[in-house]
Amino acid sequence: MVERFSDEARNTALNELPGWSQVAGREAITRTFTFRDFNEAFGFMARVALVAEKTDHHPEWRNVYRTVEVVLATHDAGGVTERDIRLAEAMNAIARQCGGI
């Protein structure tokens, strides 16, 4: 099992993740991605799904038209772990490739 980050470690990691923030009242991080249209948003989700399956770490997310709201936490650890930070980094990179604005 992976170890949950301390508040300090989580905050340090968040400082290196553009667009991500702490979820109020919960041990999780969040970001809303915006794309030009639904096609780009869905393409982003499809690419992230492949990474999530490969790493066996899945996001909580919601899509409405051109936006994708994401929450990441490692449930087994009860908070944010290295797995969440790695998936957030991958999502940021994929969003850039998919035209995220």
From Swiss-Prot:
Its EC number is 4.2.1.96. One of its GO terms (biological process) is tetrahydrobiopterin biosynthetic process. GO terms for molecular function: 4-alpha-hydroxytetrahydrobiopterin dehydratase activity. It comes from the Bacteria. Gene3D superfamilies: Transcriptional coactivator/pterin dehydratase. The keyword Zinc does not apply. Keywords: Lyase. It catalyses: (4aS,6R)-4a-hydroxy-L-erythro-5,6,7,8-tetrahydrobiopterin = (6R)-L-erythro-6,7-dihydrobiopterin + H2O. Belongs to the pterin-4-alpha-carbinolamine dehydratase family. This is Putative pterin-4-alpha-carbinolamine dehydratase. It comes from Nitrobacter winogradskyi (strain ATCC 25391 / DSM 10237 / CIP 104748 / NCIMB 11846 / Nb-255).
